[in-house]
């Protein structure tokens, strides 16, 4: 940022989950500081330090946070189109196809329109598209559709409607809450974008 010469800027950021994604966020903040010659620093906050995962968009929009990293599917309840910009269920576009659609097929314009309809006031940077979600991890074997009826299952986005129609009890939880929810019995099974 050549326009920042002689001044230092610190931006507060909050990623939406722990594990490998937090490690990638730490690497990103380090690269930004190095590339700006130390003039731009990102104060990376751990999960829950400022707001809950489900509140990141509102926190950035209101100015409580300068930036945040989260999955648009987490605001599926505000507008179902939000799920088009994250990982889909275990069918659909590959990561490369999603990026192609975003950049060359009208996806970015639809994203901006959806963002406006939801009422968020920020600029989104689309990155790290994940492949289609695996069906998940289960406490018991699933060998036929009847096995999932009544099962408490964690997912987000478009899969919510599909799996509810199959008879599952869907809970939309952030990634960082999956493991505790499995241990306490809040859910019987879960999907997450990859096995990290």
How would you describe each model-predicted region?
Residues 18-43, 161:
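Short, polar/charged alpha-helical segment
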Residues 44-58, 156-158, 170-184:
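Short helix-initiation/N-cap motifs at beta->coil->alpha
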Residues 7, 37-38, 149-152, 167, ...:
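Alpha-helical hinge/cap motifs
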Residues 31-65:
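Gly/lys/ser-thr-rich phosphate-binding loops in alpha/beta enzymes
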Residues 26-33, 61, 66, 71-152, ...:
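Contiguous mixed-secondary-structure segments that line small-molecule binding/active-site clefts
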Residues 53-74, 180-196:
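Periplasmic binding protein-like
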Residues 1-11:
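Single conserved hydrophobic/aromatic residue that forms the stacking wall/gate
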Residues 14-25, 49-53, 104, 152, ...:
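Solvent-exposed, acidic/flexible segments
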């Amino acid at each position: 940022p050549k326009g920042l010469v002689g001044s230092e800027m610190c931006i507060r950021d909050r990623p939406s989950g722990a594990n490998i994604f937090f490690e990638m966020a730490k690497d990103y903040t380090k690269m930004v500081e190095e590339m700006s010659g130390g003039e731009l620093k990102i104060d990376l906050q751990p999960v829950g330090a400022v707001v809950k995962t489900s509140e990141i968009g509102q926190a950035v929009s209101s100015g409580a946070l300068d930036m945040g990293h989260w999955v648009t599917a987490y605001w599926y309840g505000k507008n179902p189109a939000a799920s088009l910009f994250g990982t889909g269920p275990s069918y659909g576009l590959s990561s490369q196809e999603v990026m192609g659609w975003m950049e060359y097929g009208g996806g970015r314009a639809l994203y901006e329109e959806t963002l406006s309809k939801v009422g968020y006031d920020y600029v989104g940077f689309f990155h790290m598209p994940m492949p289609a979600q695996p069906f998940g991890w289960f406490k018991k074997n699933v060998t036929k559709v009847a096995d999932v009826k009544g099962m408490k299952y964690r997912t987000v986005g478009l899969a919510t409607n599909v799996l509810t129609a199959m008879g599952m009890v869907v809970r939309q939880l952030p990634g960082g809450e999956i493991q505790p929810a499995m241990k306490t019995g809040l859910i019987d099974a879960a999907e997450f974008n990859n096995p990290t």
